[in-house]
Each structure stands twice: as structure tokens, then as C-alpha cells.
Amino acid sequence: MSGIDAKKIRTRHIHEAKANGTKISVLTSYDAMTAAIFDEAGIDMLLVGDSAANVVLGRETTLSITLDEMIVLAKAVTIAAKRALVIVDLPFGTYEVSEQQAVESAVRVMRETGAAAVKIEGGVEMASTIRRIVDAGIPVCGHIGFTPQSEHALGGPVVQGRGSGADKLLADAHAVQAAGAFAVVLEMVPAEIATEVTNQLDIATIGIGAGNGTDGQVLVWQDAFGFNRGRKPRFVREYATLGDQLLEAARAYADEVGSGAFPGEVESY
């Protein structure tokens, strides 16, 4: 098993991984069963992402998921994850109004879920908010590049940091670090720029569609393991085809129930 060598991963282990060049594995998780499996597999961090709005609740965007919904999901993950560090997204509308709102939302997540950190989107414009949360004793993971909560303002899911956008991305990265974040997600960023950001920062960078030069990688598990049978982003590599397997299994079950083959003597009392 590769990755961080620790019985219980904490933010200090993420800093150590950055310093010694150990790659950091991250997957999303939204329930106890997948959290237990990913934890046993040695995944270093589990992200209870607002992507649950899409892959769990079936909504078109992440914007409608609430803090209450995120907390329910995060509770399940933290119950099952014994080793992995659990991060919870602060959803849209729970931290942008004021720094006080952000702190209150983060405090609620930590108190009610048992998570180790929260994640918020934004760079320079969110630096003071990150600082306030960190000053409240709560670890923060930043998120820059393409930020899904701002997809309408950004014109949809498009690569960030090209051309003159590289300077903004670097400024965002340094602002997030200076604000006290322990790590930062780089989403849909040219590999060369993501590598440059990684080389300049002292905190860990976690890439998603950002090439191989970041300190770690994160994917939505339904994409990575083929549970989502629809169109996937270019940056996804499928490690399994669980959606097709589940479809065939469900068909087999329906057929056996219909034919009377299930339950049989073995499954009966």
C-alpha cells in the first residue's frame, strides 16, 4: 500500500507528505460503506464533496445542496473512516455572505460531523475568510482554478489559468497559503501551471484535471470506478465499470425473482 504511513492521518501528515515527496491520494465519499472500503484501501483523504448534489441527489449543479444535507453525509463518512483525513465542502451560500457566517458554518460542520477540515472555493477574494476560519482552530483546504460553485460566472466548466490567467492562479494559490490553508485543490488547470504552483507553494496541492505534477490527486469515486455510466470529464481514468456490473447484477436478480429461482432452499429458513 502506497501513500502516507500513519494509523490516523492528520493535517501534519499532509505537510510531511509535501515535504518528503509522498503522493497524496484523495477520493470523494458520501456514505459509510464506501468510506470504509476506501479507508481500508489506503486512500489518504476522503472528501465529502458538494458534488453529492450531482452523483447522490441527482441534481444538475452543486449549488442547491444545503449545509444540513452535507452534514448528514459527512457524519456517515466520519463514522466509517478510521485512518483517512475527512474534509467536508462548505456548500454554496454558507460562507460567502460574511466571514462570521463562514466561521459559524465551519464550526457547525466540525462539531456535528467529526470531520478534520473544511474546504472552501476561491482565492484572493476568499483569503480573509480562510484566515478567520483557521484562526477559529479549523483546518481549511482551499480550492482554486475551476470552482464549480462559480460555474455560471466562469462560463461553465472550462480550463482556468491559461495565458494571462496563469498570474491570477498563482496569486490565488499564494493568497490561500498565506491565509493558513493546509492544502489547496487545483481543478482544471494546465499541467505546466499546476506544476509551477506546486513548486512555489509549501502546502500540498491536490489536482483534479491538473496533470501529474501536483502533490496529490482527487477524483469523484463514481467517475473513477465507472459507477457513473454517463459522459465523464477528460481527466477521469476509469479503474472499474461498477455501473455496468451493478446493472447486470440487478437484471440477474430480477430474472431469478421472476422465474422463482430466488430464494432457494439455501436462502430459506
From Swiss-Prot:
Q: In which pathway does it act?
A: Cofactor biosynthesis; (R)-pantothenate biosynthesis; (R)-pantoate from 3-methyl-2-oxobutanoate: step 1/2
| Locations listed in the record | Cytoplasm
- Grouped into one coarse class, the protein's main location is cytoplasm
> Might you give the EC number(s) for this enzyme?
2.1.2.11
Cofactor binding note from Swiss-Prot or TrEMBL: Binds 1 Mg(2+) ion per subunit.
Instruction: Give the EC class as a word.
Output: transferase
* Catalytic reaction annotation: 3-methyl-2-oxobutanoate + (6R)-5,10-methylene-5,6,7,8-tetrahydrofolate + H2O = 2-dehydropantoate + (6S)-5,6,7,8-tetrahydrofolate
Q: Which GO terms describe its biological process?
A: pantothenate biosynthetic process
Q: Name one GO molecular function term.
A: magnesium ion binding
Cofactor list: Mg(2+)
Keywords tagged on the record: Cytoplasm, Magnesium, Metal-binding, Pantothenate biosynthesis, Transferase
Q: Where does 3-methyl-2-oxobutanoate bind?
A: D50, S51, D89, K119
Q: Which family does it belong to?
A: Belongs to the PanB family.
Q: What does this protein do?
A: Catalyzes the reversible reaction in which hydroxymethyl group from 5,10-methylenetetrahydrofolate is transferred onto alpha-ketoisovalerate to form ketopantoate.
Q: How does it assemble?
A: Homodecamer; pentamer of dimers.
Q: What is this protein called?
A: 3-methyl-2-oxobutanoate hydroxymethyltransferase
Protein encoded by which gene: panB
